A protein has these predicted regions:
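Pocket-lining segment of extracytoplasmic ligand-binding domains
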Residues: 88, 161-257
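Conserved C-terminal helix/tail region of periplasmic/extracytoplasmic solute-binding proteins
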Residues: 289-326
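Extracytoplasmic/secreted envelope proteins and their assembly/folding machinery
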Residues: 41, 45, 72, 76, ...
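Secondary-structure end/capping motifs
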Residues: 219-303
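Short, glycine-/small- and polar/acidic-enriched structural segments
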Residues: 24-168, 172-177, 195
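Bacterial N-terminal signal peptides that target proteins for export
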Residues: 1-10
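Small-molecule pocket liners
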Residues: 42, 108-114, 205-209, 213-214, ...
């Protein structure tokens, strides 16, 4: 009988230990970025490199995006838990009935820029002059530029994702990202003039963190810890990017130290991550007003579709509980 009691106690102890281990097991999150690893993803890699995700009981895998990767499709198919996407992409997904929702925003300023020739003093001077833009601009920032500055479609030139036409034609401006194309132009010996569209009121968030609606309902606590840990990672990365950059180079060996340093410097210089509402509410914050301003921009430029419940595209439930000040 004593042996039986001892066996039962041992079994109970093992069951308790197993239950505790299960309770303490880290929550697994697979997170897909929107491009190959770069400085723009630095805070997430920093959180991984410095064990910040582990500290918050998370087992996070970062999957690089790329030209053939559609993160929102992977998300809708249940192959990942969190996707990184531009705010306009999220609104477009909701237009199509995809049950996804943005829960945080990495970039308080959209990094889209117009890059002009040296000597250009104001963005208004680009009116009537040739500008190389990609076709995707027609449903994003180009209608906004037409409305804000009176640009016309006659100015548009095809953009082949190369800075060589800009370097060869001294009348040409082009699109770009603050952290990327200006670097290539400067390497060629030209100091371009860069106009960050967000500084002129272009409203969409960039690098929003997006989940499926059912994931938000079922895993809210894990998502809250993911956003909190990511915000802590970004604060650390902006201060000292070395740990995150080492992981970035591991994932993307083609990334140079020089471009990483340039990207990090421009993130700080332009306040892309830590400006605006982030100064008051913390890194990765979002506001209802900002999302509604983006929807209003779509309506004013006739890009919005009728009878779409656009507010379904974002939720402040998670990010309201996160306050990691820059």
């Amino acid at each position: 009988m004593i042996r039986t009691l001892a066996a039962r106690l041992a079994a109970a102890a093992l069951a308790t230990a197993a239950a505790l281990a299960q309770a303490q097991a880290p929550d697994r999150i697979v997170f897909a970025t929107d491009w190959l690893a770069q400085a723009e993803h630095g805070g997430f890699y920093q959180a991984l490199a410095e064990g910040i995700y582990r500290k918050h009981n998370l087992d996070v895998t970062i999957r690089m995006g790329g030209p053939q990767v559609n993160g929102l499709q992977l998300l809708a198919a249940g192959q990942i838990d969190v996707a990184m996407a531009d705010g306009l992409q999220v609104l477009s997904a909701v237009e199509q009935g995809v049950p996804v929702v943005a829960i945080a925003a990495t970039f308080q300023k959209n990094p889209t820029v117009l890059i002009a020739q040296p000597g250009t003093a104001k963005i208004e001077q680009l009116k009537g002059k040739p500008i190389a833009i990609a076709s995707a601009a027609n449903t994003t920032y180009w209608p906004w530029l037409r409305q804000q500055f009176g640009f016309s479609d006659e100015q548009k030139r095809p953009y082949g994702f190369s800075v060589q036409p800009f370097l060869a034609d001294k009348t040409l401006s082009q699109q770009g990202f603050a952290t990327s194309e200006p670097f290539s132009i400067e390497k060629a010996g030209v100091k371009p003039v860069v106009f960050l569209l967000a500084d002129y009121g272009y409203p969409p968030y960039s690098e929003a963190l997006v989940v499926r609606r059912d994931t938000l309902d079922k895993r809210r606590d894990a998502l809250a810890r993911f956003v909190l840990a990511s915000a802590e990672g970004w604060k650390s990365y902006l201060a000292n990017p070395a740990p995150g950059n080492a992981l970035i180079r591991k994932d993307n060996p083609q990334m140079s130290d020089e471009l990483l340093a340039f990207g990090h410097r421009k993130l700080r210089e332009h306040g892309i991550v830590d400006s605006g509402d982030a100064k008051r509410d913390g890194l990765l914050t979002m506001t209802d007003a900002r999302w509604r301003a983006t929807v209003e921009f779509l309506k004013l430029t006739r890009l919005a579709k009728p009878d779409v419940d656009y507010p379904k595209a974002w939720s402040l439930q998670v990010v309201r509980g996160v306050k990691v000040l820059p």
